[in-house]
Amino acid sequence: AQEGINNLEQWVDSLIVIPNSKLKEVYGGDESIFSSFENANDVLRGAVKGITEIITIRGFMNVDFADVKTVMSGMGKAMMGSGVSSGENRAEEAVTTALSSPLLDNIDLHGASGVLVNITSGSDLTTDEFEVIGSKIREIANEDAKIITGCIKEDDNIGDLRVTIIATGFAQSKSSEP
């Protein structure tokens, strides 16, 4: 598997890796292998869906393919996460969930040099909630990081808040090969 990852890294700008060992660690050894792989596929499906929505849905603060390319081009390993929450602390809960995917390869998010954040909410998104999300992202990112934030307003989505994050450019995770 590592040989395949090494070969693939030379052809892609960014790479999301889910190690097989994480399946057992997260879901336990008594989980069906088929169920474990389906759970991993759900994570990858969510990543693809999140990136697709970022590119295709026009937002109040728009993020487009050029922004995704800016954050992902030539950046090595990537982390993609999404979190949804409602209630009093929904911003903190959604961004924390988005930043913590137990299946992803042991990537330390601190020091990311590229971060794309997309916030989806109803018209009830507050300035304080927007700031909570931005503050949490700035905590994990490199001080010189390129942080791009988008915001999609879904009028029929009152109460729920979704945060999708793509983080790249982890110095310790970048491939040393050309």
Placement of each model-derived feature along the sequence:
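Tubulin/FtsZ superfamily GTPase core signature
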Residues: 1-178
